[in-house]
Amino acid sequence: MSGLTLGRGPGGVRPTQTATFTTHHPSADADRSSNNLPPTSSQLSDDFSFGSPLSPADSQAHDGLLQDSLFPEWGSGAPRPGIDSPDEMQRQDPLATQIWKLYSRTKAQLPNQERMENLTWRMMAMSLKRKERERAQQSMFPARRGSAGPSGIAQLRISDPPVATGNPQSTDLTADPMNLDDFIVPFESPSDHPSPSAVKISDSTASAAIPIKSRKDQLRDSTPVPASFHHPAQDQRKNSEFGYVPRRVRKTSIDERQFFSLQVPTRKRPAESSPQVPPVSNSMLAHDPDLASGVPDYALDAPSSAFGFHQGNHHPVNHHNHTSPGAPFGLDTFGLGDDPILPSAGPYQSQFTFSPSESPMASGHPFANLYSHTPVASSLNSTDFFSPPPSGYQSTASTPQPTYDGDHSVYFDMPSGDARTQRRIPNYISHRSNLSASLQPRYMFNQNNHEQASSSTVHSPSYPIPQPQHVDPTQVLNATNYSTGNSHHTGAMFSFGADSDNEDDDGHQLSERAGLAMPTEYGDEDGFSSGMQWDGQFPGSFHSLPGFGPQHRKHVTIGSTDMMDTPEEWNHGGSLGRTHGSVASVSEVRNREQDPRRQKIARTTSTPNTAQLLRQSMHSNNNTSHTSPNTPPESALSSAVPSRPASPGGSKNGDQGSNGPTTCTNCFTQTTPLWRRNPEGQPLCNACGLFLKLHGVVRPLSLKTDVIKKRNRSSANSLAVGTSRASKKTARKNSVQQASVTTPTSSRAQNGTSFESPPAGFSAAAGRSNGVVPIAAAPPKAAPSAAASPSTGQTRNPIQAAPKRQRRLEKATEMETDEANKSAGGRSKVVPLAPAMPPAAANPANHSIAGGQGASQEWEWLTMSL
């Protein structure tokens, strides 16, 4: 047969075919064409059922032309081993057969029909040959794969240079003009189909190319990746020939797995030097493919090796290299504290590390060291941490970033309340220490957070808690599951000023979601009294910061009262939980529903939990909490931002109030149903405070009466309707005011019905120590004791029941109280400046009844304006 179609003759279509098709025999060709004459195209077509239109004469003519004139070597006609038959070719390489069919059908129209046919055969032969080579190589592949064999790149390199050389191993291979095999680039992946010579050379000289470790070898070398790691999937990729190609842009051609395998040097930069942003940082992940691949993993290792384990556990060497794979990408693994990227990341700047309490890393002592050394203070100090310290917590509305914990903490810490507890304040405090003073004092949760603080302080190093950095949704969401349940409060603590209104209810959930460890860190179980003696310490430190108190209202400052022991049931939720303890207290106490926005304002510690305050006053152990009640003069603070239930925690003034009669800094009256604070935290009487809050200007004394009248209307309306903004403000205030007024009015009316109302009202009054909310006149003289005792017993229970419930009860009670107050207390709420005095007198008794702290209680009533 002429070499045209079957490649016979010295210059056969594919000299290499023989190598590939060693089984092909001339006899097979003879079968196809007796006499070994080149089959005509028609014959080929018939044999192949291609239905070639060419006639034998045409085919022969073309064959003769090509053989004699162009390719005399074909004239030999010596049958060369070739493809056995199209059928076999079909079986061996259907694709090649299809291509051959394509050309066989179109060759009639092609300028060089015979030549094209030859090329077609060559292509098919190449494909078949390639398959044969592959099979031959596959036999070697297991060994090659086991051994460091050239990776895809190396193979390509190996195959490329020798391509031009003839394959000596192919017996028929000669430098034939038509030996296209060596010159034709496989139409398929070159790596998949290296040229025959290249393949053979690569087989013999696999090491000739730059040896690239096989993926398997690297994987073997690499330390086992934690199950949490996602890289194993990458390893699968890497096993493939192109595994060396990174899913993302690889920093180096070297397998990125080395980085994960602790072969940090292979990484672009060592983990130590590289700013391992906490895996949670999405932007970081986007920037760092390695981290991106590892991020989900880092925390999922239950050890949260990133958290505590890195510390002592997996790779002490990488102890600070939080990237140590041994601690599978825990936060520590990434060296969050050290990570320069974190600071660059934004609000977490300055190695914000995490929200102090919530951040699994920052909270736990294991990380206390980690993050303490981290100059958290630098960034967190005043501005980076959520917001300037004066904003108490960050202005949560503007800087929700405490939810960094939401990013991490929630995922990391939420796994267990204990974890959160463990990672709790201690480290954070150390960071806080770096933070502005206000932040520090604020977190002066007595480290005694009972066991909470201690556990958070002490346990973190090992963080037995898996603290999966990635959310354990149940962990994150079920703050109640945590003994601390602080996540609830945490949410409140870090409620966003703007959003906090609705967060009162959502606060704990939010915190849970956020995984804020704050409440936990505050020691919810222990109640506010146990862990977070925020109020006493915090109000002073918190509000002591100039402008910190009044301003922080908006910023959902953590009020000391909030830390007050909320009902233990809420405690688990975390006293911080606005919905639960402190947060719920003020906002809830207020007509939270009436003023959803304010209601949302998370009364974090900043907002005294009236119930908590009352309760604490009852317990009288939370003196600091009382501080917040005492702080109430500071409550004027909340008048600074009337729109916000802006009562920060207890105020300095509150302390003054407890120490002596509070004097309105505006009208100098010492008699007022409710003490408020101006933005500076100076005590204002209810009238002045309300005026300031409503109008944003100091109440002109000349307008005092008018203002009071106006305010009274709005208060009554707000209480009833809570429609207008002022009304809403009033309503919020009224929640407390109602409490105070309600205590008189409600205590009469509510003693029977308002079991909840007095708690709501009273709790609101007590909890509002920081709030500007115009607490209605303190309980009437007669009513105070009645109200106080119901409040004492009932308020405490309602508080325990739940500030949120109080809020609702309060709302219902407010409606009742509204009517009662409108009739009786409506004026006294606003106007009660005068009535307040008798209540004030009664208030001490009331308060002492409730809290056993007369002056403190009195101030609590005054402070209820929060």
From Swiss-Prot:
Main location: nucleus
Gene Ontology CC annotation, any one: nucleus
Skewed-composition ranges (Polar residues): 15-25, 33-46, 273-284, 392-402, 602-618, 714-725, 733-756
Composition bias type Basic and acidic residues, residue spans: 589-598
Keyword Transcription regulation: yes
Positions annotated as zinc finger (GATA-type): 664-688
One Gene Ontology term from the biological process aspect of the record: positive regulation of transcription by RNA polymerase II
Biased composition (Gly residues): 1-12
Record keywords: Activator, DNA-binding, Metal-binding, Nitrate assimilation, Nucleus, Transcription, Transcription regulation, Zinc, Zinc-finger
Bias type Low complexity, positions: 619-629, 776-791
Subcellular location: Nucleus
Range of residues in the leader sequence: none
Xref: Pfam families: AreA_N, GATA, GATA_AreA
Entry annotated with the keyword ATP-binding: no
Molecular function GO terms recorded: DNA-binding transcription factor activity, RNA polymerase II-specific; RNA polymerase II cis-regulatory region sequence-specific DNA binding; zinc ion binding
Region span, Disordered: 1-89, 188-245, 260-287, 382-404, 562-663, 711-763, 775-854
Role summary: Major nitrogen regulatory protein. Positively acting regulatory gene of nitrogen metabolite repression.
Name the UniProt record assigns to this protein: Nitrogen regulatory protein areA
Organism: Aspergillus oryzae (strain ATCC 42149 / RIB 40)
